[in-house]
Amino acid sequence: MLINVPASNLVAALDDALQAIEDSGDTLKGCVNLSLFTSVKIQSNELKKVVDEVNKISHKVFGEEKDLIGRVYEYFLKSFAVNATKEEGEFYTPHDIVELIAAFIEPFDGTLYDPCCGSGGMFIQCAKYVEAKQGDITTVNVFGQEKEDSTFRLAKMNLAMRGISHHLGDGPISTFDKDQHAGLVFDYIMANPPFNLKHWFTKDVTQQGVNWADYGTPPESNANYAWILHMLSKLKADKGIAGFLLANGALGDEDTVAIRQELIENDKVEAIIVLPRELFYTTDISVTLWILNQNKRGGMHHGRQLRDHRGEILFMDLRSWTENPVKGEQKKKVELKADQVKRAADIFFRWQSVGTNGATYAEPELYRSVGFEELKTNNFSLVPSRYIEFVDRDNNIDYDKVLTETASAVSELLSLQCENDVMLRNALKQLGYECK
């Protein structure tokens, strides 16, 4: 045990431990930085103090906690995300957002794919959600890909510590440059791609002949629709479901109208949910949760009888759900509570279910089911505010009363200003300085 190792030998002992992890099997091969402690030149005595403090932690404090190491690992990932820049923080998706996506697509069995898996957080939080719903995470086969080397290693360690079997490919590389799961299609997809990614269209994309699901090549200026079409191509044709986040601009970009029209007319888009601002640590923008579904024909699904809802899209606007600010964080942030996640999912499930009339399914300022004809008249825009009714509260304003009160307040301010002007002039005059 490290606690018994003298300070003078501790650096070597820790590096030996890293080497042992490297040699333990293929799961963590290439994940650890060998000779790390030697290279960073930490003072042996200081390192010994840290080891001694860690050894004071008693597992008894955590009771039956089975995932202590995993929780500690996640804590440090989150701490780094809090202090990271926008680009650095892309590897981490807050747990409440993952829970929302999982609640909508219910990845309880089969295969789960994330084409930009970051540190593996989607998989971890999804596993927790499945277990909380009395599901068996061993029935879910995880597939992912990540282009950043350090983040790829974080993901492998993160999943290994949780005992989650995974397939992340042979190494880090962009999904667009090389699909390491070519030929495979999946039951579920969850993803949080980098928002508005530029410079994604490389010569490798052209040479690989990426499958855009027969929708044509997406704009090179922005990867949003490249992600959409890639994920659509990776869904099982008869039942695949995807839930992913994109910047709000993807809802109505002029240069993607043709692709968006085809997605809508082919009945691939099931729901569009605009989320509150400040859900992320590294950006305060509002983003959208997209739900794609290869089967809107109805039937039994996870114990629910679904109606045929082809020709409809459910729009939801959750931007006002900001009543839960996270206290104690260095950056302003809000989160979605479990009851809010459930409420949003219930709205979605009711809309899908037998007995619901999609033509009238609506609640002002929150959600509305919309048919293709109305989408067509709006040039296939997917911006929820185009369709959800918002109450014009200005109609209830007594403008005469408001303006009268405003005029009275301005008069008082002007009168007070005159009084202050006289007082200031008199004060200066008494000092021998007179204002002209």
Tell where the protein language model's regions lie, with residue ranges.
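Non-catalytic, mostly N-terminal accessory regions of nucleic-acid modification and defense proteins
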Residues: 1-108, 166-168, 172-180, 274-277, ...
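Generic detector of ordered secondary-structure context
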Residues: 46, 64, 93, 147, ...
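Conserved S-adenosyl-L-methionine
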Residues: 87-191, 196-214, 226, 246-249, ...
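Signature of N6-adenine DNA methyltransferases within the class I
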Residues: 178-187, 194-372
